[in-house]
Amino acid sequence: YILKAKEAFNDPNDPNFIKMKNVNAFFYFKDDTVLEVFSEKGIYNNKTLDMNFSKNVKAAYEGSTLTSQKAEYSNSNNFLQISENVKVDDIRGNFTAEKLYFDISKQTLNIASSKKGKINANINIK
């Protein structure tokens, strides 16, 4: 991955944490695809390599876009969690949810909603 920010500051309370503003992250996968993530704020743990993105999070992957208010990539626990007003737009359809939880090692996705367990989805079936 490559992690960039317009501004970055060491956390005075913990030197392992770097607070960032206007963050861009690029995750490169073995199949030559790239996930790009942008947020207004972020925190990087230079010991565990974990990343937190917050405020107007936007992501793009192979023509799909995602927006939310929070995203957490845990390198140490092998998961990616997207939360708070999650919206996904794709050529195959779109949906909104409260939280997405990707278990990277199991390659599973859990979609959660606080609206009586329901998500709003429109799927294009051909």
Q: What does each of the following model-derived ranges do?
A:
Residues 1-126:
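Mature-chain termini and adjacent capping regions
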